[in-house]
Amino acid sequence: MKKWAPRVLLAAALAGLSAFLLKGDVWTFWTWWLLAFLMGMVAMPVTGRLFAGFEDKGWMFSKVLAITVTGFLTWFLVTAKILPFTAATCIGVSVVCAVGCGVLYHFQGKNGIDCFPSGKVNLIYGEEILFFIFFLMWTYFAGFRPQAYGTEKFMDYGFMEAMMRSTTLPARDLWYSEGTINYYYGGQYFAVFLTKLTGSKVELTYNLMRTFVAAFAFVLPFSLVRQMSVDRLKESLTGKKRCVPAVAGIIAGLSVSIAGNMHYVVYSKIIPWLQKLQGREADSYWFPDATRYIGYNPDVPDKTIHEFPCYSFVLGDLHAHVVNVMFVLFLVGLLYAWMRSVRMREAVIMKPGRKEFWKKQLLIPHILLAAVMVGMFRFTNYWDFIIYFVVTGGVVLFTNIVQFDGKVKRILAVTAVQAVEIIVISYVVSLPFTLQFDSMFKGVGIAQNHSMIHQLLILWGLPVVLTVLLIICIIWEKLRGGANRSLYKLMKAISVPDLFAIVMGFCAIGLIVIPELVYVRDIYENGNARANTMFKLTYQAYMLFGMTMGYGIFRMLVAARKKVFKVVSVIGLVLLCWTFGYFGNSVYAWFGKVWEPSEYKGLNATSFLSNDFTEDVAGIKWLKKNVKGSPVVLEANGDSYSGYERVSAMTGLPTVLGWYVHEWLWRDDTADLNEKSADIESIYTSSDEEYVKELLEEYDVSYIFVGSKEREKYGETLNEDVLKSLGEVVFQDEVYSTYILKVNK
């Protein structure tokens, strides 16, 4: 009892702290945490087998696996038009999956298979505490700036509202009423899936989903790198060194989830310090500068983007690349678990018949699941489909080189067949998305612009140097004395965690180099050609580097035989920890005085309406309360990243045309968009009643919203007499002149 008392007290203290900090929002917060706990525990019969070599049996990864399987199955059944997208469907699919896990657990028990981490209570407790702390921390911060307004938030929140209304997927495009969403909407889908599963309100879960992902961005790298460190250093872990795996895991988790880059160190600390020494006024620092450096400082016509998770979690967009963070981290952990399981066995003996051999190679659970995950990325974040097909292929190739004793023909044959298997499975499972998706891909272009060397060094010098140093350290140790000269012998001599770190490092470096050579063409050719390519590739490189550095620094500190590796590792660790200061800088700049709980505003993402859209808030609330389904509500269209489309974004109700640049990117038909824009103007301003009526019928408009943006855009040309003659006023603001018309049909 005495042993458990401190743990119970700590858990109770954290529960009390969460209630104090989150106030009324704590119930939804607890619901999501409890759901993740239960889903992860129920999925352990599957996860425990996949991560059998992990000390925690993949406990943290099990949460993501459960969400992935239940959410993906629900999506597949809905998009295949087998089931409607309702709360009952989400719950039903989850229950069926839970029953399946229960049956599997029963048979495992009969066969003496232990899928739970027996004897690792302290480890599981520690991981759960870390998950709860980071989930609480980010949720609390979000409550200081909860509004789904600014940057991409209208789109992200609008996607969620549209899917909450829809019983089919993809949902009707809220900014293009004649079509369905033509973008990879999977991230917002999973947020809606969890919202329906828990019976929560989307106004709260918009913010909760991003803080949920942020918590996983710490605990998954922690769990993986901790296990890698245990596997590599277990013989050296005596005395005080026993804490090394946990510390390495923490550094990896922090590197992925809250670190910045050396831009913060150079431009926020070093340069201002030098300016003060010279008696000059120190430059101020704005945290987004770390993501808009190449092309902006100095200002040249090659604007790029190089964001990273901490920036995303602070900014608050629930974009595709953000939600997919937890899924790609799960995949990386799964690949390590597979590589480890192969290396823990003896090399495959080729005596079994040809049929049995190929059956075994094609039915590897880890590869089958990896193929499904890669396919799922097509609709969660399409770029990650390409990136992690290559990462998965790299792990498969390196593993097969070792597994098949360096026999080239066998290695190439098996790797090629498994690559085809991954492509085929990923293609099949993503068919419900790809069959309804018009690709935005316009081809690959040769990069005409290149980053300045000093900029690359500031952004990527630290992780690249530490990664290359780790690779040199590992290879040098194995080549000493003339041993392991062949590629196979060298790779065979390298331990599993070292080999996996090398794969992650090579992939990360490749992702940095690619935008310097080629880019994917899109609508941003003029001055921003490399922006999207660099953004999506280097975002993943950042996470791979974070885990590689977390592992590599402590691996070299403990196990390197040359002092130079240890010295550089210490320097690297100091610089890496210095980048953690970005977290504090950005949190204060964006959220304000987070140390004052009284400033907490709550998680309601629509709370900004009362101040920013005073004239429209009552009308928007009326639509949310009274209009069911997805009828077309006409509002004035406007530019992307503006206050236009506040009605469709906050209600999920489709309008004829929304943010122009977004629809241009998604549909690439400016003539059509311009025609719709002109038609909307005609509806609001034309004096020809019959013509307006024809347009309303053509676009199947059910409601017309007349509020602040409509008066701002059309001014005195707004023909309210014609509009009112074509419908009934169903809402009239008592204070302002905003009203809603229901069109006569």
Q: What kind of region is each of these model predictions?
A:
Residues 26-30, 34, 119-129, 133-330, ...:
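Active-site lumenal/periplasmic loops and adjacent helix-entry segments of GT-C-fold
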Residues 1-122, 422, 427-478, 507-515, ...:
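Membrane-embedded, hydrophobic transmembrane alpha-helices
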Residues 584-745:
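Extracytoplasmic
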Residues 1-18, 38, 83-142, 229, ...:
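Start-transfer (signal-anchor) and selected internal transmembrane alpha helices
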Residues 312-315, 368-380:
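Membrane-interface alpha helices of multi-pass inner-membrane proteins
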Residues 20, 144-145, 155, 262-306, ...:
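Transmembrane helical bundles and short interhelical boundary loops of multi-pass, membrane-embedded
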Residues 327, 384-395:
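Transmembrane-embedded, aromatic-rich helix segments that form part
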Residues 2, 44-62, 73-76, 103-120, ...:
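Membrane-interface junctions at the ends of membrane-embedded or membrane-associated helices
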